Amino acid sequence: MDANLEAILYLVSGVLFIVGIRSLSSPETARTGNLLSMLGMAIAIIVTIIGLGDITDPLTMGMIAGGILLGGGIGAVVALRVPMTDMPQVVGILNSFGGIAAVLVSVAAVLSPADFNILDATTNALFLGSSIETSLGVIIGAITFSGSIIAAGKLQGLISGSPIVFKGQHPLNALMAISAVVLVCMFVITGDATWFWAVTALAFLMGITLIIPIGGADMPVVIAILNSYSGFAGAIVGFTLGNTALIITGALVGSSGAILSYIMCKAMNRSFFSVMLGGFGGEVAAGADGVEETRPVKRGNADDAAFILKSAGSLIIVPGYGMAVAQAQHAIRELTDELTERGVSVKFAVHPVAGRMPGHMNVLLAEANVSYDDVYELEDINSEFAQTDVVLVIGANDVTNPSAKTDTSSPIYGMPVLDVENAGTVLFIKRSLASGYAGVNNPLFFEDNTMMLFSDAKKMVEDIVKAL
């Protein structure tokens, strides 16, 4: 293929990626954004295959076709069979694929540098820039791979969702980071691949030790950070391969993931480093002063909730992780339809870090065909709680905790929360009075205008619909 035509097609592919990502910012254009991004990827893949040279070689084309069919087949099966409630785990696994791909390409480049045109014929060693590229690619890729596997394991429940900490953890991570820099320098200076293999093994270990101390409450940020890592790893590999489309795509994914991480950290009033250092929510506190709460709560059932909702003129539903665990989104949609027919104004309030991945609640509500126009972000709806008759909270513990605004000793102090306590009545569906991932009790449970509905979220909502 002509070099100029190849460059133009890669540029078109990059533009499609940019427009596609931009379209994902709105639910109304998200589907179009996905299609544009798919088209961009298809163009990039076809151009890359043609650019290999002899595309008539049966072995080469067989390997390419086999890879496309195998990967596409697995992806299709996953997309069709995995429920939307498991999307955080899927995103974590997909991030790990990006990481291991970067590792494999970097390893291949070190093993056969001549095939990648990165071998200096005069010294019979990798070019200086190529040595740095492959080292960075394998470090970021390996950390992304092992870290994403740990994150997915935590989300799936295969690994404890609580922070796993041990004495000397932070000094150990710092020591490994310094060691990685030293190993890279030795590889670049000497060209001895032994240093490269050492830093590869160390990076895999770093991915584990960096993620295990991070608790479930911070998983949305971790997923965004690992997504960013996978993007930057891909961009670095793009330089090694000399692939413009891969550089553009990796840079887009990396930068957008980094920006999303910053936005979510800001939404929790946490710094990036405090999230990555982990340990948040590791000690379960009973209350603001460490004393277990013994105050009585107002308990209710489905009939009580139905009676209150029948008399309401306005309702705001606040979904949380409890909705995802119980897979209650479709039952909630039924409740919404029933109340709307009765003339009740129903809106949804979504906190930026509700759930276990960025946009977790939005994805689940979209699956249940909840209208995009009825879903509001924190800053757009917080002022409306004071004028709302009833708020229905479904397992959204920490993001509705008023102590974030009043208790300076609370771990979540300063985190923007939904002002649900200002509503006329708060119906809170929860299995028990247990604290959330932040490890602090929610004083909202004990307010006079709060009624606790202890049950599985899906069952309780279904019972409320029946009672209506």
Task: State where each predicted segment sits.
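Structured cytosolic domains appended to multi-pass membrane proteins
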Residues: 291-468
